[in-house]
Amino acid sequence: MSVQWGIELLKSAGLFFLHPLFWFFIIITLAFGYVRIKRERKTFHTRIADIYDDLKFTYTKGLIPGLLLSVILGGLGISIPLGLLAIIAVITAAAAFTLRANWMSAAYIVSVSMLIGFGLQIYQAEPFLERFPQGFAVVWPAVAVFLGLLIITEGAVAYRSAHVRTSPALVVSSRGLPIGQQLANRVWLLPLFLLVPGNGLESHLSWWPVFTVPGGSFHFLWIPYFVGFGQRVQGSLPETSIRITAKRVCILGLAVAVLGAASLLWTPLAGAAVCTALLGRIFLSIKQRVNDNAAPFYFSKRDQGLMVLGIIPNTPAEDLELKIGEIITKVNGIPVKNVSDFYEALQHNRAYVKLEIIGLNGEIRFDQRASYEGEHHELGILFVKDDREDEAVASGS
């Protein structure tokens, strides 16, 4: 028996890399990066990170959370039919074409897939069902719990890394003033180890799987599941806003998982879990946007000092350990309140730079370093500025 299980595990691992979504999302992720870079160059005449940064993020940041979720799914013995997995893959690919990660939330993808699967069962779509003989032998409570756990994982990965290297943007307020924003548009690969109903292995344990596998037999399947999170922030620091939303997503996922578990006793609660996930995620997105719009602009021009809107990697700004949201008040001992002042102050000492900074904790600190030939002329710092300041800096350089 152990040999058979080992063979099944090896086969499922090999199929992981043959899954169409694994390769499809390489193209999609590069497209995410291309669109981001194009927007950043249009606004700031430079990019924040290269196109491969999105690729590295997507294919590495979700590995450990995905494996942890797989352990939980395997321990519970949750089985997901092949037909439903096919629908999830198609809906995921369709959502990815929008290049908006917020549409790739598990609350949307899996909920819509469950509704489609339920509809196919209700209306007996024979041609489709015959293509997957056991593809829709669905234990709806198991899938509802699966949905809840996915949403919790989505919130966890967003809390952990969605705020990392957000993309800055500039817009014009209703008063005609430049306003800074931070955009998170992230996707994570979650490697999921699933049980799929079908001829293959049988459990000889009376307590496992917890969620019954129809027919009593199953096989293993590793799949690349892609989950997304998108958010625009202009009324606070991106880490603060994103982590608040991520916590709310985790709470939503917990509520969905509880409803899914309760549906073991009364199956219609699985439908309530789907509706809770779908409507709850929409509500959280609207709530975040309304609250953000109501808050005072965080990234705006100040009477004293320049607020850091973005930091280009591998530049002096990164060496100085500057953070988004900090305010630079003096450069080489000279007070600055616009980009022209900042650039002129740098010219007073081309070999050395000393900054006076108001940190995120409100305290003043000093950072300094040597300057070298060929380094970014603004230290790799992006500020909230208008076109006239761009022209002034260009003429000065």
Swiss-Prot record:
The chain crosses the membrane at residues 15-35, 71-91, 103-123, 132-152, 187-207, 210-230, 249-269. Keywords: Cell cycle, Cell division, Cell membrane, Membrane, Septation, Transmembrane, Transmembrane helix. It is found in: Cell membrane. One of its GO terms (biological process) is division septum assembly. Residues 279-363 form the PDZ domain. Gene3D superfamilies: 2.30.42.10. Interacts directly with DivIVA and MinD. Belongs to the MinJ family. The main function of the Min system is to promote the disassembly of the cytokinetic ring after cell division, thereby ensuring that division occurs only once per cell cycle. MinJ acts as a bridge between DivIVA and MinD. May modulate activity and localization of MinD and MinC through direct interaction with MinD. This is Cell division topological determinant MinJ. It comes from Bacillus subtilis (strain 168). The gene is minJ.
